[in-house]
Amino acid sequence: MYHKTLPYRIFSVFNYILLAVISVCCLLPLFHLLMVSLSDTAPANAGLVTFWPIGFTVEAYVKTFDNANFLASLWISVKRTVFGTALALLVNSLAAYALSKDNRVFRGRNAYLWYFVVTMLFSGGLIPGYILILRLGLINNLLALILPGLVAVYNIILLLNFFRTVPKELEEATFMDGAGHFRSFISIYLPISLPAIATIALFTMVGHWNAYFDGLIYMKGSENLPLASFMQTIIVQGNTTSFDPAVIANLSQRTLRASQIFIGALPILLVYPFLQRFFVKGIVIGAVKE
């Protein structure tokens, strides 16, 4: 039977304490934000709120959800995240499947792989990208937020390395049963690669949900902005024109901002626990080459 040595136990205790401290440091700002959003106007403006609400009220959340532009931005972000993640998983997994084959199966594979890798080092630039979106007529279109980042080379490489770990005998068995590449991809590769796919889904979801710069460039009008871009105009630029002046006069801007930030962070916080069990496994296996 394996017995843990004293140095190992001390090291483990130290690690647990360190991770606990880091976790608390990460959670405290979010918890403080929640307390500010649930506090009354006067103590929030005076900076008296720490880790317990003063004058408990949910008025900031009521006014936030009464704001039509905020709800429109929230819906745009939901659509962008759902459709953008689904399309990215489809495109990147198909590309990774093709690139995981050797040159005997996919001629020119190395050339295509280098073509993808070069895009990680050099981008097309902001102005050419805007001109392209403009010429395609995608300004104020949801596709303008999805298509430019649809192909993520890092995710393709992660999946490619994962696909290479799939035993070739499984694929050969499906071919002997009369299946083609697409059938093999659906029935063999996708189920086995669930940890890597879940990891990429999490990366893509977080990227779409938190992206704000492209919304400011490609979307015109506050009613067309995704949530991150909408909050950027309010929090960073101080633009509160989307709110009723009476709301601004009677409610602290600090509590309003805190409620919006917390609402914006909540969806990812709720999704992550369901995907985190795949996260480490997907990264480790996808990063290893044979």
Regions found by a protein language model. Name each.
Residues 2-290:
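A hydrophobic, multi-pass inner-membrane permease signature
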